[in-house]
Amino acid sequence: MAELDAQTIINYISNAPKKTPVKVYLKGNLGDLEFPAEVETFLEQHTGVIFGDWTVIEPLLKEYSSAIESYHVENDARNSAVPLLDLKNINARIEPGAIIRDKVLIGDNAVIMMGATINIGAEIGADSMIDMGAVLGGRAIVGRHCHIGAGTVLAGVVEPASAEPVRIDDNVMVGANAVVIEGVHVGEGAVIAAGAIVTHDVAPHTMVAGVPAKFIKNVDDQTAGKTELEDDLRKL
């Protein structure tokens, strides 16, 4: 997976057209109304739905006020620079309620659970699970066959552009509600206990816990057994 650097993300956000997408339900005498190409319409004679940007649609609602008896507007973003990721062709399991922005890389057979939030530039390796309510900030990198526990935060770094992202190597287990701050590198096979706040790099095949997180022990057979991942959960 190729890391998307901070300056590229900053330029993308800065130069992207800012959009306020809306969905508008209409009722009235709609048969003769004309809409520009940038407005998507699903209209019958007396009812219909239109999609487009509020800057285009708002003037049309005023212009056609004599023909439109009533309307209802649904809107979930204002001047948004980054759309949500198109999920249709991603070879992963992504559950309802996950919020994943564009320019995120998701490996094969990854699992993204309900309520997870994944920001622009983040990368998730094959067979990794991002559990419920976890937050992956901008440019956070998760390797292969990891588990990022429910409520965990991997701090994002889009600004300042010089900051280093969080890097989680392969086969890492992160317990629920842990926090990994920007620039931390977690080595392969490490275990981070639930609720830990990780402020320094974690060596491979070690376990850390506490606030701030400290070395507890090397990962032994008992710990590896208790933190073993279930491949069946990753089958598509």
Swiss-Prot record:
Could you tell me the superkingdom of the organism this chain comes from?
Answer: Bacteria
Q: What keyword terms does UniProt attach to this protein?
A: Acyltransferase, Amino-acid biosynthesis, Diaminopimelate biosynthesis, Lysine biosynthesis, Repeat, Transferase
Gene3D superfamilies tied to this protein = Hexapeptide repeat proteins, Malonyl-CoA ACP transacylase, ACP-binding
| Family annotation (PROSITE patterns) | HEXAPEP_TRANSFERASES
Acyltransferase in keyword set: yes
Please give the function described in this protein's UniProt entry: Catalyzes the transfer of an acetyl group from acetyl-CoA to tetrahydrodipicolinate.
Q: Which HAMAP family match?
A: DapH
Classification via PANTHER family? 2,3,4,5-TETRAHYDROPYRIDINE-2,6-DICARBOXYLATE N-ACETYLTRANSFERASE (PTHR43300:SF10), ACETYLTRANSFERASE (PTHR43300)
Q: What is this protein called?
A: 2,3,4,5-tetrahydropyridine-2,6-dicarboxylate N-acetyltransferase
The protein's gene is named dapH
